[in-house]
């Protein structure tokens, strides 16, 4: 912190639909660059590890497994950095698919925040694939990348 301020950045890496490995590599590059510039918190777009427009592929367990593996790679490869990172990915919670922000730092996943308001008009069709956070109104824990992680729309 300098003068009481926290340096925050947002990044929009190149993304290939359903190519979690590529998307993870691009995300990791941006995290490393931001950390090198003294950024303390970096946020990425929703579903950046899978791509937003996967459509019915979100129902495929292979995509969900690859997204989790991609997250694990990023978390492990950036464990020596101080930066707090927030990435977007689908996460299965008690047989419901959630569109989540995943927060991590120094090799530890700090929490999951599921999306609350899912659009369902014009080109947006999120309610077809995802469940809003109101389905899990209370804080809970989920297992992600071998870690037990708190999850809540009100996670602080």
Can you name each region flagged by the protein language model?
Residues 1-156:
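Enzyme catalytic cores with a strong preference for nitrogen-chemistry domains
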């Amino acid at each position: 912190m300098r003068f009481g301020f926290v340096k925050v950045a947002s990044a929009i890496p190149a993304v290939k639909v359903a190519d979690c490995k590529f998307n993870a590599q691009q995300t990791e590059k941006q995290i490393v660059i931001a950390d090198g510039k003294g950024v303390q918190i970096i946020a990425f777009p929703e579903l950046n590890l899978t791509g937003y427009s996967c459509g019915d592929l979100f129902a495929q367990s292979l995509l969900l497994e690859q997204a989790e593996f991609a997250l694990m790679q990023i978390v492990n490869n950036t464990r020596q950095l101080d930066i707090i990172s927030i990435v977007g990915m689908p996460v299965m919670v008690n047989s419901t698919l959630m569109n989540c922000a995943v927060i991590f730092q120094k090799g530890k996943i700090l929490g999951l925040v599921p999306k609350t308001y899912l659009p369902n008009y014009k080109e947006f069709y999120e309610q077809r694939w995802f469940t809003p956070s109101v389905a899990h109104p209370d804080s809970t824990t989920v297992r992600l990348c071998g870690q037990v992680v708190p999850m809540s729309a009100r996670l602080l």
